[in-house]
Amino acid sequence: STVAALMLHKEGYEVVGITMKTWDYAASVGTTGKKETGCCNLDSFNDARQAAVQHGFPHFILDIREEFGDFVIENFIEEYIAGRTPNPCVMCNTHIKWRALMKRADALNCDFISTGHYAQVHQHNNGRYFLRKGIDDTKDQSYALWGLQQDLLSRTILPLGTYHKKDIRQMAHDFGYPELAKKNESYEICFVPDNDYRGFLKRKVAGLEERVNGGNFIDKTGKILGQHKGYPFYTVGQRKGLDIALGRPAFVTEIVPETNTVVLGEEADLNRTEMKVKGINWLKYDGITEGMEATTKIRYKDKGALSSLYTYENGINVRFYTDVKGVAPGQSAVFYEGDDVIGGGIIQRTEQPFSIQLYLYL
């Protein structure tokens, strides 16, 4: 974000720096004595303020901890309790971060907002604004931005999207911030910096561990394989950390919160041919034609799978041309036309290949 601000400043924009405070470290991980890390630590605030002072533009801290906690963190907890796997970064970008930035931009009479995300904003000849992948495919973040509405995209500038990460690091060095160029990237959830989301849930939900401990692991025939530590502490596709020895690799294929049950199977049991997606936000077009082809990504690092899209109720039915593995309800499905984002939504449920369905219900 600092490099994005300096790039725009160099191009002649009148820049106002904003650093967002989204969460309280101590409230999330407790007083562990560990150094505060992640996007909201004191060092990141100081780095941003130093750059602003040195280049002569104002800098403010925007405290959105209350809004972030009320929506993003609560949604994170509720989704796991519902047996789904949330994506808090998508929720934050869609519902909190951009809206808060735009509100402050309006108060400061700013025309645009800008962030350090690796993606591009373009306008189609139909007048609609849409996202395009950043040219550095290894750093592209368009997947996490699918929820941005037209009024936000029309006033968003993403200057890093047409550069590779190594070029941005070189720019940071050229701007006089060699330490910024050397900074390691943070991949953990900002409010779970120790990457222990299970511990986070236990701290936030009183009595959760006692309430869900001792449910059954079962296979796809319903046979009980053992007991688990509680369904919210597992995700579809998980293999490691199951704490059960079956003498063969086992994967979480389904989570049933109503009965505190976790279904285990072989890797092939993760294959899915269809999924239902709701909460759709269209970007490039204002909708789809029935059977429209798209490359659908089901997770951030996913390369995407060719699919056809069909409307159903108030959502989209995605039919994959080949089986896809590890589709997790609660995650985002993002539809691409080449490098362009058509739209996206939240995965509700999946359909297994017919052969597996037949086996399950005979």
Spans of model-derived segments:
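AMP-forming adenylation/ATP pyrophosphatase catalytic core
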Residues: 34, 114-121, 125-362
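ATP-dependent adenylation/nucleotidyltransferase module used to activate substrates
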Residues: 1-146, 166-167, 357-361
